[in-house]
């Protein structure tokens, strides 16, 4: 007799730092709120929800009642809220101190808002690098989700019975332990098949697949994807809500409860053990690997403008860490204690600005806007420049000149700072000013972008040939 199947679902909802308010409003009205409306009507359907810090900030200001509804679902055990870096950074790309700070900020907000001590993490853009287990375990994270394609390299050593292969897809069931430097976390492989089918295929097709993966022992399969697919993407609101796809899907899960269950990831791990150990290379979901040429970091080669933003972020993070360290060395005289209180506030504000400037969306481009959207780049620069200004103020820095490799090209540049602006000058380029930040309005006057060839241009050329 075949055993049971557990469907693990994680829904990720996010809007970038600097996005237009009307986009938040539309996403809430078309996707976030109606999804919750349907979920509340199906209390036996359990899943995980992730709201990025950027979105939580907006919801706190504009839709507090919505957060209360989420908290009620968490309280009754139907929903698990997942942590992440607060402002949705690509975790492998930011310094360790910032990884810890961003995750700690998110976990603190989840405790305050939802009374939940999150142990699971939504990994931004599912960008994985092998050193992450150390950072995640140190931050109090037990498990995260990566795409099944990242496990393909380990296929020969994975349990054959938990691999599902056909002409279109390869799925991996269960969860797996991995470690780095003695720290371990659990990885759930997310199904590309389910990501492509839900919510676009009829409910019956997904149910047929779930029946097909039944084994002699209980198994679990993971679905993880963006909440915006459930209403905000073109034509999905009509299909998912007006035509009733989501309600039909949840009803089908309840109807088939004799052999099919839904759990949160936390619930699942209370009763199940890992299905083995695995060690994954750097990776992400398949489409991201296509856009980036196999490594997310290639975006910084393809787009020098993205690299300029990235290197500026790293430079400010290092500077802020130096200011923190210097502050810790201040002796405890009365005058210095007063100065220390002021500096602590400045450093705290600078840290928040830095974290907001680490929001990933403006650092890369796939098929959506990303780096090409000037308002997203402008928002990143706004926060990074604010962080630099506050760090300079905390350091008591009036004017300075520094010689450093500011753009990671192996050659030195000159960084000039005054109370009103910062200039980056590249001698190797004939003294070109490559960065010109005004602290008052918090803008980079050289924030421009060259259009480049993208693979999807071939489709346009073919269409109009």
Residue spans for each PLM region:
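Positively charged, amphipathic and often flexible ligand-engagement surfaces
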Residues: 86, 90, 149-155, 187-201, ...
């Amino acid at each position: 007799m075949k055993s049971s199947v557990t469907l693990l679902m994680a829904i990720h909802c996010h809007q970038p730092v600097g996005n237009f308010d009307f986009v938040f409003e539309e996403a809430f009205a078309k996707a976030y709120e109606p999804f919750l409306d349907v979920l509340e009507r199906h209390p036996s359907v359990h899943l995980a929800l992730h709201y990025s810090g950027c979105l939580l900030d907006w919801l706190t200001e504009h839709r507090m009642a919505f957060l209360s509804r989420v908290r009620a679902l968490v309280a009754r055990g139907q929903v698990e809220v997942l942590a992440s870096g607060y402002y949705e950074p690509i975790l492998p790309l930011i310094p360790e101190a910032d990884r810890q700070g961003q995750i700690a900020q998110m976990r603190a907000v989840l405790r305050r808002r939802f009374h939940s001590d999150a142990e699971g993490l939504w990994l931004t853009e599912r960008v994985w690098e092998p050193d992450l287990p150390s950072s995640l375990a140190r931050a109090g994270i037990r498990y995260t989700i990566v795409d099944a394609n990242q496990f393909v390299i380990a296929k020969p050593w994975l349990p054959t019975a938990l691999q599902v292969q056909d002409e279109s897809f390869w799925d991996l069931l269960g969860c797996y332990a991995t470690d780095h430097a003695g720290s371990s976390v659990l990885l759930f492989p997310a199904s590309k098949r389910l990501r492509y089918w839900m919510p676009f295929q009829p409910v019956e097709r997904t149910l047929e697949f779930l029946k097909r993966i039944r084994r002699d022992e209980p198994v679990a399969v993971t679905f993880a994807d963006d909440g915006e697919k459930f209403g905000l993407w073109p034509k999905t609101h009509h299909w998912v809500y007006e035509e009733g796809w989501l309600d039909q899907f949840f009803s089908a899960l309840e109807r088939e409860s004799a052999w099919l269950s839904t759990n949160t990831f936390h619930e699942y791990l209370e009763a199940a053990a890992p299905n083995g150990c695995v060690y994954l290379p750097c990776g992400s979901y398949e489409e991201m690997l296509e856009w980036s040429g196999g490594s997310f970091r290639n975006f910084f080669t393809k787009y020098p403008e993205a690299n300029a933003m990235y290197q500026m972020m790293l430079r400010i993070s290092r500077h802020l860490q130096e200011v923190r360290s210097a502050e810790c060395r201040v002796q405890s005289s009365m005058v210095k204690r007063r100065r220390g209180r002021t500096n602590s506030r400045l450093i705290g504000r600078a840290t928040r600005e830095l974290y907001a400037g680490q929001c990933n969306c403006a650092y890369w481009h796939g098929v959506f806007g990303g780096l090409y959207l000037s308002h997203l780049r402008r928002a990143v620069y706004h926060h990074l420049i604010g962080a630099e200004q506050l760090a300079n103020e905390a350091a008591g820095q009036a004017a300075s000149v520094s010689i450093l490799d500011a753009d990671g090209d192996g050659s030195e540049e000159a960084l000039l700072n005054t109370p009103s602006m910062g200039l980056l000058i590249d001698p190797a380029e004939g003294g070109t000013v490559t960065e010109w930040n005004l602290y008052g309005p918090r803008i980079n006057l050289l924030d421009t972008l060259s259009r480049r060839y993208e693979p999807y241009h071939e489709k346009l050329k073919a269409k109009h040939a």
